[in-house]
Amino acid sequence: MTSIAIIGAGTGLGAAVARHFGAEGFAVGLISRNQERLDTLAEDLAKDGVRAKGFAADVRDPASIAKALEQVTETLGPIEVLQYSPLPQKDFMRPVLETTPADLVGPIEFSIYGPVAAVHQVLPGMRFLGENRGTILFVNGGSAVKPGRNVTGTSVAFAGQAAYAQLLNEVLGEEGIQVSQLIIGGRIIEGDAEKDPAVLAGHLWDLHTKRDRFRHQISAD
């Protein structure tokens, strides 16, 4: 059995992705900062027949991300899919003229250093799985492609992450590893035809299985 590692796993999109991939036979590694919440989520997923386990890590600490991903592999099996989708902190979102150099440190650690550390950790295992197996999924808000003057930190950092993801797509595609980005404009809304977590999880599954595009965007704002 292979696994999906979800960095930024929570009760919304993360849980929906866990259920979707779990139903397809994946074990699920849940990664976020709060171990207690992860344990509760894993218990809920188990009721639906999903084999899941939580591993606490801070995305702004590359060593903790690497350790958590190593534990996923050791406990649940090789990581076939990595999803990077942590929710940015509210203090990352400041107006452009009020944003100082210090204000950008957190967003850049969160949205660039974190995924770089994660990718470096999972790549050897994905290469070992062979061509057309491994997938790296990035989930971003609309500011990744349309910067907002009042959310400067995430606009700058998400743009950097998007560039990194596209470069990975170009290079790793030659090795049969898919790299894709799901852009979700606005909030995730339960029951919405486009932005319900289960609907979005379906798009992420399609990006993994169809392997035919870099970016899928849900609304512009």
Label the model's feature ranges.
Residues 68, 83, 107, 114-122:
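Hydrophobic positions on the long internal alpha-helix
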Residues 48-51, 71-84, 209-213:
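A glycine-rich helix->loop->beta "capping" turn
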Residues 25-39:
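Conserved glycine-rich Rossmann-like NAD(P)H-binding loop of the short-chain dehydrogenase/reductase
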Residues 10-12:
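Conserved glycine-rich cofactor-binding loop
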